Amino acid sequence: MTHPNDHIDAMLHETRVIHPSAEFQAGTRVSRAEYERRYRQSLDQPDDFWSEVAHDLHWMKDWDRVLDWQEPHAQWFVGGQTNIAYNALDRNVQRGLGDKRAIIWEGEDGEVRTYTYAELLREVCKAANALEELGVVAGDRVTLYMPLIPEAAIAMLACARIGAVHSIVFGGFSVSALADRINNAQSKLLITADAGYRRGKPVTLKINADEAAKLAPCLEHVLVVKRAGIPLEWWTEGRDLWWHDVVDRQSDQHEATALDSEHPLFILYTSGSTGAPKGVQHTTGGYMVGTYLTTQTVFDLRDDDIYWCTADIGWITGHSYSVYGPLLNGATVVMYEGAPNQPDWGRFWDIVQKHRVTILYTAPTAIRSFMQHGDEIPGRYDLASLRLLGSVGEPINPEAWMWYYRVIGGERCPVVDTWWQTETGSIMLTTLPGAFPSKPGSAGLPMFGVEPALMTRDGEEIGDDDGGLLVIKRPWPSMLRTVYGDDERYRKSYWGEIPHVYFAGDGARRDHDGYYTIVGRVDDVLNVSGHRLGTMEIESALVAHPDVSEAAVVGRPDPVKGESVVAYVLLQDGHTADPAALRAHVSSEIGALARPDAIYIADALPKTRSGKIMRRFLRQLAAGQPVQGDTSTLEDPTVLERLQASPAL
């Protein structure tokens, strides 16, 4: 018996369809026919499909078996041995790419550093030798707490080269969050920097590292990169070591360790519903194959591309699509340390123009911020080098999608929206450019080997043009293997909600063409007068109004309707609020039941430095409750006070 609350009402229907140009289609890596052939093979003959992909890469020992699936645990390329750092560096040098640029790094202060593949290999070998000198061996955990500088990528690859398990903690996290993650992983080494730069000022990291180290007795050493050259308040002799003292004197030769395909590669902590961080554990072989294939196909990668994923490496997007995926493909990667509005809102477009970026992969929250400041700023820059745009991190509103396509892409660049998670390791849903038309706001079609479905809580499948719970019906190579130190949490969170399928925690709908649209986290679905509404749809309707640049919608308890709709809205520069017009617009786009009961006009939303809106704080404010929880990760904690003082309209 299906409970009515198993369905999510799909009420906002986007009808625009954007076709790739004939020129783009002619040169695309994967055509529609090729996608359909390979997708069918990936489901019907998965061993053959994944063997073919994996054999593009170097294996020190071939596997005995492609997949061993003992639900809910998968092992991929069983018995095989490889090394992801070897594949990202040595293999590319051997392919003749030694003189090709691997990383173009730009600091917020304008400093530029470039590493060829041969140079990057030498730096990684030196760092790997340094780690071994400090007693780090395969299987040891190493925590990175760093700004987005080349040494962060070098440290990642050095860990992977010797089989150490890296755990990267975003540089915006607090002392307690850092200490919790060090202790959970039982890391013996912390790699950090004196400081990074953000909005023209040094953001000290060593101070937080020192405080966290006091709470983490497992740490033996703290390796410090001198980024800002600021005076340090504290230095513990014997524990603290300068990167340049230890790394620079090492040999630039190092033999990569042959690692079992299932050897842990990294742990990345993500917030759970309980507030306790979950250490998502990924392994070497499957993650390598998944990120290699998706980078190549989703971004239609070509030899001369200059590829820029704007994510910090503290997040999964930075792991998979700033470092591992592009380098495995021999691409040239742009990295930028700093804020998108330093010194002004033209900084991103200056980087695109200066470095002739061809592929840009960024987040909807950044796109909406650029929208807020109008078309004129990007119009000052030459963006003609761009040929492909990508979106990641959250569902993108159709209006933001269209602005990105029109203003940044000049109506010539396909936009690939991508749905995936820390847990999935690589992109799961997207619209391959050149193969299919795009539908603004829709994540699109499944990637190779991915078999999604929409279900009710009791496992009943839901048809097209209806909303339900997004699940994945079979294992895939880059999937997480466990929650570090808590396998029961892995079983319960991902495979225990609905029997025999991976539970994504997202609501979605699928149209008659098979395109999936994410309507929001299951936790963010509102129950208004018996209707389950995705907050994403209401936000998209608000952003479609010409006065609005960004919106966040939450629910608050209502004695009559169950929940009422509360909207926090940012206006376009120079526009004024007309709450009646906004309510009427939502009513016409979706229906009267989605009309916001309260609208708050905001000058900013509570976001982390990665751009995620912290909706739990908005829910607390909407309900009139005091703000509870760690606010140290917010870009601007004072925004909560301003929102609290804002009157409802």
UniProtKB/Swiss-Prot annotation:
One GO BP: acetyl-CoA biosynthetic process
Residues annotated as binding CoA: 198-201, 317, 341, 529
Reactions this protein catalyses: acetate + ATP + CoA = acetyl-CoA + AMP + diphosphate
GO CC, alphabetical: cytosol
Region described as Disordered: spans on this chain: 625-649
Residues that, per the record, bind ATP: 393-395, 417-422, 506, 521, 532
Keyword field: Acetylation, ATP-binding, Ligase, Magnesium, Metal-binding, Nucleotide-binding
Cofactor requirement: Mg(2+)
Domain of life where this protein originates: Bacteria
EC class name: ligase
Residues noted as binding Mg(2+) in the record, renumbered to the chain: 543, 545, 548
Stated role: Catalyzes the conversion of acetate into acetyl-CoA (AcCoA), an essential intermediate at the junction of anabolic and catabolic pathways. AcsA undergoes a two-step reaction. In the first half reaction, AcsA combines acetate with ATP to form acetyl-adenylate (AcAMP) intermediate. In the second half reaction, it can then transfer the acetyl group from AcAMP to the sulfhydryl group of CoA, forming the product AcCoA.
Family from the record: Belongs to the ATP-dependent AMP-binding enzyme family.
NCBIfam families, sorted: Ac_CoA_lig_AcsA, PRK00174.1
Protein name: Acetyl-coenzyme A synthetase
Organism, scientific name: Deinococcus radiodurans (strain ATCC 13939 / DSM 20539 / JCM 16871 / CCUG 27074 / LMG 4051 / NBRC 15346 / NCIMB 9279 / VKM B-1422 / R1)
